[in-house]
Amino acid sequence: MKTSLFKSLYFQVLTAIAIGILLGHYYPELGAQMKPLGDAFVKLIKMIIAPVIFCTVVTGIAGMESMKAVGRTGAVALLYFEIVSTIALINGLIIVNVVQPGAGMNVDPATLDAQAVAVYAAQAKEQGIIAFLMDVIPGSVIGAFASGNILQVLLFAVLFGFALHRLGSKGQLIFNVIESFSQVIFGIINMIMRLAPIGAFGAMAFTIGKYGVGSLVQLGQLIICFYITCILFVVVVLGTIARVTGFSIFKFIRYIREELLIVLGTSSSESALPRMLDKMEKLGCRKSVVGLVIPTGYSFNLDGTSIYLTMAAVFIAQATNSHMDIFHQITLLVVLLLSSKGAAGVTGSGFIVLAATISAVGHLPVAGLALILGIDRFMSEARALTNLVGNGVATVVVAKWVKELDHQKLDDVLNNRAPDGKTHEISS
């Protein structure tokens, strides 16, 4: 029992995070130097994301009986994303207005370091809904894979899958090759995941060593408020959706606990993407649904980021005494409904989208971003964790709506009853 515990990835990552926190706290300079370990692990994961998405989507679509089913899955997924993302935005807006973490700070925007956020503001100006949509189309297929742009790879994979499906029996050889290649890729993922504890240790040691636990105190109320809001969203909103769909959110969280710990250590939900594709399929969701919903959700279903954006924007208004009436807040909500969809496609995602939103709304001081800059790194864990759980729940929900969910397998796996390799008929 003890041997299996020590060998489990869950235990190893949790231990690594704890050691990283201790090193960063007691030896901050040494902790800050551990950054390359975390960066290297995230780069290894990003290296494999594009081929994983390509193989999963192509084999999923090409193996389907009807192309109408693919279109239906995509439409249902986008509808779900829009509804739940809107709920997340409203959830953050309500709680930040009730708690008012920025009230009483009385910060003069003129005293803030505008230069500290100048780079983010400049990047934000380059972002827009048209630019985001145009960026989905790659300049070249090789460029899409080289840059690791999830949506570009997804677009090419969908088109490739459609074309391969139309070939019928003539395309069977290509299908078999891609499926075999997919098995090799997942073998590589298993090897990379053995390094997860080292990556989590390096990233956590760097965060605590560079920013220090003390930097949390001044703006701690916002951080605590944000974390509680994310927990409430997962338990109440996603929990209700899960219950209606037929499973327990707590059992689901236990099922993906290793992926959650990897995300906690690296602060990047992308670091768990390859494993989530595999795990959601093992949970009973058909491969074609998993291949469409998970990658698309990384740009269109960022629940944690949505909560962060509304809370951070209103916090800046409260801290700088910038009045926001109901009209201003509705305007903020509408702008965020559009701008939040590009969050995963931008380097520094959440913070840059926040800068773009504040610039677009107009009546909030852009310099107020400096208040958030110092603590943004500590809020990224809650964002990433909520995003991951949200995308996992979305996959199960969409799979059920389009009748591509194996309910018996879902129940068996979440209750630890299904032996490896056991399959069931897909229910309708």
Swiss-Prot record:
Q: Where are the transmembrane segments?
A: 5-27, 47-64, 77-99, 141-163, 184-206, 216-238, 289-311, 326-348, 353-375
Q: Where in the cell is it found?
A: Cell inner membrane
Instruction: State the GO CC annotations.
Output: plasma membrane
Q: Which GO terms describe its molecular function?
A: fumarate transmembrane transporter activity; malate:proton symporter activity; succinate transmembrane transporter activity
How does the entry describe its membrane topology?
Multi-pass membrane protein
Q: Could you tell me the superkingdom of the organism this chain comes from?
A: Bacteria
The main location class comes to membrane
Which InterPro entries is this protein grouped with? C4_dicarb_transport, Na-dicarboxylate_symporter, Na-dicarboxylate_symporter_CS, Na:dicarbo_symporter_sf
**What keywords is this UniProt entry annotated with?**
Cell inner membrane, Cell membrane, Membrane, Symport, Transmembrane, Transmembrane helix, Transport
BP-aspect Gene Ontology terms: L-aspartate transmembrane transport
Protein family per UniProt = Belongs to the dicarboxylate/amino acid:cation symporter (DAACS) (TC 2.A.23) family.
- Matching NCBIfam families: PRK01663.1 (NF002461), PRK13027.1 (NF009587)
Functionally, this protein is described as follows: Responsible for the transport of dicarboxylates such as succinate, fumarate, and malate from the periplasm across the membrane.
Q: What is this protein called?
A: Aerobic C4-dicarboxylate transport protein
